[in-house]
Amino acid sequence: MTHHPSAASLRLHGARLLFPPVATLLFLLLTEYIARGALSGDTLVQYIFPHAEAYLLAWGLLFLVWMAVDWLTRFAPLATLLSALLGCLPATVDFYILQLRGEPFLPWDLMQVSEAAGVASAAGIHVQKSMVVSGVVVLALTVGSFFLYRGRQKLPWVQRLAGFAASTAATCALIFGVFLQPAVTQSLGILPDAWM
């Protein structure tokens, strides 16, 4: 006798399959919302659509990070929170740096985070509505992922390590094979001055 899954279990499985790509896509939009301070149709047309390849790659990075953390820990809320932070924290720093000096966040700015926080405070720059809204959305998705993935089947360590290794390898390939290769990023239309 074969076991046929119920409609409810199929819906739950479908929701669990759709959650990571949809949540990480939403995190990508929140990242843009935070960095620009607003998200409108004009933002989509002027900044996102012309650089669709770059945004697709950024979404892929957030998705792969979600998958790697989930495979390793089997704790979806942690995967959700970390992938959201990976996008939203640099966007927050970028927003403040644009406010302070008129140019985007650059990797070496990480060395000056504490100094920048003091300058931002002295300059009267405050938490923006986009950051609060994004925080609420991230919190809701993190809590929602707890309930969505609660009670899911435990996997043996071998499967978990294999999934983690595959996700991590794909993440590294994306970082080292695309993002850190100027010729590749240039061929995809990802230019340093395109984000100003």
Place the predicted regions along the sequence by residue.
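Transmembrane and membrane-interface helices of multi-pass
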Residues: 9-195
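Short, basic, low-complexity termini and linkers enriched in Ser/Thr/Gly/Pro
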Residues: 1-11
